[in-house]
A protein has these predicted regions:
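Generic recognition of flexible, low-complexity loop/linker segments
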Residues: 49-51, 90, 304, 316
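Solvent-exposed loop and beta-edge segments used for protein-protein assembly and interaction
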Residues: 55-57, 94-96, 156-158
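N-terminal targeting and processing segments
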Residues: 65-66, 87-90, 122
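Short, polar loop/linker segments at the starts of domains and inter-domain junctions
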Residues: 72-86
Length: 340
């Protein structure tokens, strides 16, 4: 992880932290590349980070993408850019009885030993700390003592939160859980999920960036809003596979170039499973700036960035705020998510 939320690009290609064998479980897409580019260790096609949105300011919201065709054996669910793609917010910590598995935003699975409340572990190969909440202060002289002290008390003291950083200067990546509306059949209080997701960032000056996740419905758990360190508010427009299929069929019916309407088989309402992890079919369609304290009356009338997808849910094209196509991608029809 970089200071601004990019993928991990330093350290080993893959590692089990705390394990005596140091068995690599996947590779870092931002690491060694050559050719098209292809990672020479596994022959996986990779694309280094591409930034679609970055406004200046303290602890800004930076939206970027990285791609790797490599499939880890312990994948996180497919993210909002489709199979193979990762966004800075695509960080997930799996809580297991015998291990903590961090699915980073570079497509890797990094294994740690379980942590007790307040315990911290440092990975020399990744130059990264992973800390479990539950302690008011770190010992005097500890590398993270000042950075830990800058966190709000409710974060520091919660044993249910995990935090990661790659620098004593910060920022912290806060790994929590998304609130949800309980169902009528749920037993209350509902147990916490066996994983943690990125809920925000905090820097050494006490500034925060917050991800707002949906609490109910088809988009439950997904990020639909962001407030950055400058107080700007962004709305993330998400679509389901069924919504995109209906839009495609409606567009086909109204198009003068179409001799017959688009069939359900050509653009299905649901997506089949892939080797890239479970896929709910939810994709990021556009990002809007909804509030800017510095320019409250000068908000843009168009999205800052827009995305389109194939019938298989693969990222097809990227458009900037002038609606100009700035990137396009093609994929292997026989292997969903594999870029060509």
């Amino acid at each position: 992880m970089t200071q601004y939320g990019g993928p991990i690009v330093q350290g080993s290609a893959g590692v089990r932290i705390g394990a005596p064998t140091g068995v690599a479980c996947s590779v870092c897409p931002g690491g060694m590349t050559s050719g098209n580019p292809v990672n020479p260790l596994l022959g996986a096609k990779v694309l280094p980070g591409e930034t679609d949105l970055a406004l200046p300011g303290p602890l800004p919201f930076i939206l970027s993408r990285t791609y790797s065709s490599y499939r880890t054996r312990t994948p996180a669910p497919v993210g909002v850019f489709g199979p193979g793609w990762k966004a800075p917010s695509d960080i997930r910590l799996q809580l297991r009885d015998d291990a903590l598995v961090l699915n980073d935003n570079g497509g890797r699975s990094i294994h740690f030993e379980p942590l007790l409340p307040g315990e911290a572990v440092y990975s020399r190969s990744e130059s990264m700390w992973l800390v479990r909440g539950g302690k008011a202060a770190q010992p005097d002289g500890h590398t993270l003592a000042r950075l830990w002290g800058a966190l709000p008390p409710d974060i520091r003291l919660s044993p249910h939160l995990y935090l990661a950083t790659n620098s004593a200067q910060g920022p912290w990546w806060i790994l929590g859980w998304s609130e949800r509306v309980p169902g009528a059949e749920d037993v209350l209080p509902a147990p916490l999920p066996p994983y943690r997701v990125l809920t925000g960032l905090a820097d050494r000056f006490g500034r925060t960036l917050t991800y707002r996740r949906e609490a109910a419905g088809d988009l439950a758990g997904e990020i639909t809003g962001v407030t950055d360190g400058a107080g700007r508010e962004f709305r993330l427009v998400l679509t389901t596979q069924a919504q995109r299929a209906e839009e495609a069929r409606t567009s086909s019916l109204s198009s003068s170039d179409s001799s017959r309407p688009l069939s359900a088989s050509a653009f299905p309402d649901t997506l089949p499973g892939t080797e890239y992890g479970p896929d709910r079919g939810i994709r990021l369609s556009a990002v809007w700036l909804m509030h800017d304290p510095a320019y409250p009356e000068s908000l843009p009338a168009a999205p800052l960035v827009r995305y389109t997808y194939t019938e298989a849910g693969e990222l097809l094209a990227v458009y900037d705020r002038s609606n100009t196509q700035v990137r396009a991608f093609t994929y292997d029809a026989q292997h969903p998510g594999r870029m060509v």
